[in-house]
Every structure is written in C-alpha cells, then in structure tokens.
C-alpha cells in the first residue's frame, strides 16, 4: 500500500518534469512545441490545436517558412491537351433595335389575334 502511495505522485508529476512524456506536439517545421504558455527564451510563432501556442526558441532564426521545390517540367513539347487548354473564349454580341412605333401600329391595325396550335392524335 505504501508503494502504491509513492508510485501515484510519481505518475502525476512525471508529465510535468519530462516534456516529451506529456505528449507535446512538434510545430513550426519541427523546431517548436505546442504549449499552453511559452517558457522564458521562447517566442510564439503560430497556434496549435486546442488553443495552444507554438513556442519556438528565440535564440535561433526561425523566420524561414518551409518551402517546397518547384515541380520540374518533364516535357516542353506541345501536345493535344495543351491545345485544348489554350482555347480562347469568344463572346458574340447582338444588337437589338427597338421599333416601338411599328409594333404599336401593327397591333392597332390588325388587333391581337392568337391561334391555337394544331394537335394531331395518332392511334
């Protein structure tokens, strides 16, 4: 029983003493740790999950952002796909002229007549 009472405080204090045991995640290109509060000599560079700060040692230059290398072009010759992708879009323009006087005269002279369409039934 005494051994259990000694082991229990050790298990509770162990995550406080060993940072890697507490499960702190790495951040900022694996040079920082996610913590609730940064220690002395550390600067906040980003935010982690669960509202934690990414604490990076301030004595190193961590201004660089991880970069990716550009994708090399494997073939510089043009193919069918290139021709399809370089199709230029055109827009057709239509002019609409209003002949209001002519429409009014034709409606007055003839009257508005509507005819029903012929319906053919097949048996």
From Swiss-Prot:
Transmembrane segments: none annotated. Residues 100-123 are annotated as: Disordered. PANTHER family: BETA-DEFENSIN 123-RELATED (PTHR15001), DEFENSIN BETA 118 (PTHR15001:SF7). InterPro entries: Beta-defensin, Beta_defensin_dom. It comes from the Eukaryota. The gene is DEFB118. This is Defensin beta 118. Residues 109-123 have a biased composition (Polar residues). GO terms for molecular function: lipopolysaccharide binding. The keyword Disulfide bond applies. GO terms for cellular component: extracellular region. It holds the Pfam family Defensin_beta_2. Host defense peptide that exhibits antimicrobial activity against both Gram-negative bacteria, such as E.coli and S.typhimurium, and Gram-positive bacteria, such as S.aureus and B.subtilis. Inhibits cell adhesion of E.coli on intestinal epithelial enterocytes. Causes rapid permeabilization of both the outer and inner membrane of E.coli, leading to morphological alterations on the bacterial surface. Binds to bacterial lipopolysaccharides (LPS) with high affinity, and may thereby be involved in immunoregulation through LPS neutralization. One of its GO terms (biological process) is negative regulation of cell adhesion. The three-dimensional structure formed by the three intramolecular disulfide bridges is indispensable for antimicrobial activity. Its main location: secreted. Disulfide bonds join 27-54, 34-48, 38-55. Keywords: Antibiotic, Antimicrobial, Cleavage on pair of basic residues, Defensin, Disulfide bond, Secreted, Signal. Residues 1-19 form the signal peptide.
């Amino acid at each position: 029983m005494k051994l259990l009472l000694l082991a229990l405080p050790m298990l509770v204090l162990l995550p406080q003493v060993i940072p890697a045991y507490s499960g702190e995640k790495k951040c900022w290109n694996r040079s920082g740790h996610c913590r609730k509060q940064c220690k002395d000599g550390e600067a906040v560079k980003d935010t982690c999950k669960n509202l934690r700060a990414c604490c990076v040692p301030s004595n190193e230059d961590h201004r660089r952002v991880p970069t990716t290398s550009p994708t090399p072009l494997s073939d510089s010759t043009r193919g069918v796909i290139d021709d399809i992708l370089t199709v230029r879009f055109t827009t057709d323009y239509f002019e609409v002229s209003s002949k209001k006087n002519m429409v009014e005269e034709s409606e007055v002279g003839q009257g508005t007549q509507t005819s029903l369409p012929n319906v053919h039934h097949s048996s």
